[in-house]
Curated annotation (Swiss-Prot):
Protein name, as recorded: Disintegrin and metalloproteinase domain-containing protein 2
Entry's transmembrane regions: 687-707
Residues carrying sugar: N128, N226, N279, N359, N463, N489, N569, N585
Extracellular side: 19-686
One MF term in the entry's GO annotations: metalloendopeptidase activity
Disulfide bonds: C293-C376, C335-C360, C337-C342, C449-C469, C619-C630, C624-C636, C638-C647
A Gene Ontology BP annotation from the UniProt entry: gene expression
Amino acid sequence: MWLILLLLSGLSELGGLSQSQTEGTREKLHVQVTVPEKIRSVTSNGYETQVTYNLKIEGKTYTLDLMQKPFLPPNFRVYSYDNAGIMRSLEQKFQNICYFQGYIEGYPNSMVIVSTCTGLRGFLQFGNVSYGIEPLESSSGFEHVIYQVEPEKGGALLYAEKDIDLRDSQYKIRSIKPQRIVSHYLEIHIVVEKQMFEHIGADTAIVTQKIFQLIGLANAIFAPFNLTVILSSLEFWMDENKILTTGDANKLLYRFLKWKQSYLVLRPHDMAFLLVYRNTTDYVGATYQGKMCDKNYAGGVALHPKAVTLESLAIILVQLLSLSMGLAYDDVNKCQCGVPVCVMNPEAPHSSGVRAFSNCSMEDFSKFITSQSSHCLQNQPRLQPSYKMAVCGNGEVEEDEICDCGKKGCAEMPPPCCNPDTCKLSDGSECSSGICCNSCKLKRKGEVCRLAQDECDVTEYCNGTSEVCEDFFVQNGHPCDNRKWICINGTCQSGEQQCQDLFGIDAGFGSSECFWELNSKSDISGSCGISAGGYKECPPNDRMCGKIICKYQSENILKLRSATVIYANISGHVCVSLEYPQGHNESQKMWVRDGTVCGSNKVCQNQKCVADTFLGYDCNLEKCNHHGVCNNKKNCHCDPTYLPPDCKRMKDSYPGGSIDSGNKERAEPIPVRPYIASAYRSKSPRWPFFLIIPFYVVILVLIGMLVKVYSQRMKWRMDDFSSEEQFESESESKD
């Protein structure tokens, strides 16, 4: 069987030092403080590409020679989920310039893997000894702690015969012919489940750093294969796990692969790994042997028991990756590697020091890499910066070079726009190549550099400052072709077009009767995939997503190279499908493409009909005011005459675009004075209350004074009146 289970007995006895280890384990190890001394450095474009350190360990000075080894792509992302369960990309910036690997001078069988982003952090291995090194965070200087990692000798790894292909006892070591050196690249997506996240740091920065250490060590071990493991993306399940993580390893692997098929479609990767924490476990991992490039089986789970060191976990990850490439475990009596313990030795996770691949593993890899099963390792992702130092005049355009035609080539045909002596732009040149460069000058802003290819694409424009014409397209999930299909990565994922691409213009997308009839057979004519046991049965809900079934309306016999064409007459229609040999590089053409509509709000994904919510389409008509569509950055790409960002304002001469387009209009200045004047005219003045109080006090005082004056005058009048009456009375009495 292809399923590999790693059974580890006595694993709880395995010790080592890492931040996540138990205190009991720490007490066994000697920790010392050292100050690394940088003695040499080579830079390119302002960044170190080679560096040498002197490092004192237990009173002896060792010299570390290091070379830059990047493994992060430019679009590397770390994902998590918010409280609503919606996946988000964490806003963290990661440097791809500070990951190094190398060796210790004077020790041929040595290996150094460190990050220099914030001090030195990583592993040193020579002989059968391993050391860990980390910056001393409380130190104001460049002090580091260094410690010897000494895993105790626990029980050996055991393998059940029913689960693993052991190396044939009659295996013969054959000489390997020298081959042309070819670089290979494996892109992996790693998922860290909740308990694992909490165990190794419970902080996104700390956990990310530890995963980087795993990948760095894996790359150093895979160096003899000329294989670079690229961490394409990382995912944390911090609040809750997305699948059940209990149970044995093979069931967990099945659940993870099922989840992967539905939720990792738009995150580029060749393999996906789930890292799970367990207090104790019999198994340390599971994967499918030789299935690295089969998208249905390209995955693995690694179980991290409590006492396992980070270094041992890296060895487990390397063994799982090796098994998925078809490598077998070593027969220790027949396989040698020049160091005490080989990588594919069952005891490798228990050991310290350098572990290398044996001659048996080298031959296994040679067989794998020359087979059709290794096709996913042939593509070369862009890694920046390059660890190779640029040399002007060697005929190769390297990092930070505009041109390099070599001494002879430059003499015969001098390069335009470029100075061959410096490999930089020549005087007066603004650019040298690219769609937005013309005769060494940048094209003007707003000039079309790429027309829309179909309704799922958008037209791009030069921005006047770069020679690059960025590629944008309509957001995945947007309806197309009269709302029958949806857009996927800039193309209308039309079933009609799929059939015409295969069988010509006389073909069309098959009827539902054709799909239901043929994809229910689970044979060469129709199925939902191929597994180790043969053709996979299509459940009723998934039959529109299995083999691509087309209707054919021509009398000409179809002939496709390397493929078998199957005909069927169903309900009066000629239905056709095809079959490629297993492992053929065009075998994916015989399946319905991912993203093809298979029902209301459903699309095909890995031969299953699933809800389309994973596409994340969230662009309604109101967002762009019915005058635009959302692009792949979720910004409105407006129709002609409508201006971004929301397609509300109009300008007759504007051809359409988004805030990402090179023809973005400059924002018009806001009419400040009219706005302020209008604001004051439309509102009555609001005097502060404390300014009104004195006014009222004065009024009240004046009123009081008036009342008092009035009262006094009235009193005077009354007194005068009384005096007159008294005078008159006295006069009358005299008379």
